[in-house]
């Protein structure tokens, strides 16, 4: 199955596509971006464009100027940012691609286009470059929302420093974007505390700047999929709890990366190239947030290889000890288990009332 088609089947409804200025291998340049954006558009997915303003990865540890821009002063960089942003978005618009959000910079917690746009060196330069990108976006897509994206969504001091700095220097933005990775939290993988701190930060950003907030990146190790699902389910729930309804979405970064792809272990596919149970957090999300886990009566009949229930459910899923969905059925009061090996399984049952129930069953 093609990647975007598969992710859409898992109830993901939006895609975030990065673009580099002049990458050496061509991946993530404007032409490559157009191919991916067309694919997403044809699937009816909502689209975010993520400008790195670099020839390769830009992140908190590096914000390297594109090779062609290295000699530019501030005014030259403002012009280059505006032209690059305008040119890429015009290409998409001319191909009838609807763009809903645009990031001007990627994880710019200390600015971008170092050293000129490094926030700790010159917040005013960083604000000017951000505004150059913002204005260029609005020229092409007046209704697109522009995102300034910062890492460590739990770090309120960092966010106040950056957005106070932008505000005081004439910076423009529509949405505050956050990354949240529990592996980077003060206590590694303490996702509950990370999520709590992130929600507090999101609410503070809404109060302080009256801007929407969005989780534009998150992830957790692929080999603790059940934990990752709990993290994501809670994060999605908390984002929907942001005051005044101003939490606008959650994106998983590179969910399709698997195992130890290029040294990255925070994807959500296993070593066989299949999505893990973590991504179930995105399924039917408006409904799932209101579900309540309870036990229910379950019966296993080895003779006919069947699990049966005392009521009919909208959907039933059987999950292995490894966290994989191994059986599903809809509108049913039983499910055949003939193809399953002996062992312990979790059965999730979604009632027509919208209530989710869980039970453990031993097949022998």
Regions from the PLM with identified roles:
Residues 299-300, 305-307, 344-364:
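C-terminal tail/sorting-segment detector
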Residues 204-208, 223-234, 238-296:
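Aromatic-rich peripheral "rim/lid" segments of glycoside hydrolase catalytic domains that contact
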Residues 318-326, 345:
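Short, glycine-anchored, charge-dense loop/turn motifs used at functional sites
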Residues 30-31, 59-165, 169-173, 185-200, ...:
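Active-site cleft segment of glycoside hydrolase catalytic domains centered on the general acid/base Glu
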Residues 289-317, 334-335, 339:
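Glycine-centered coil/turn sites that cap beta-strands in beta-rich domains
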Residues 15-17, 47-51, 100-104, 146-148, ...:
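Hydrophobic faces of well-ordered beta-strands that scaffold small-molecule active sites
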Residues 20-22, 52-54, 104-109, 149-154, ...:
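Active-site beta-loop-alpha junctions enriched in small/polar residues
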Residues 2-58, 120-147, 192-202, 206-208:
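Aromatic-lined substrate-binding rim segments of carbohydrate-active enzymes
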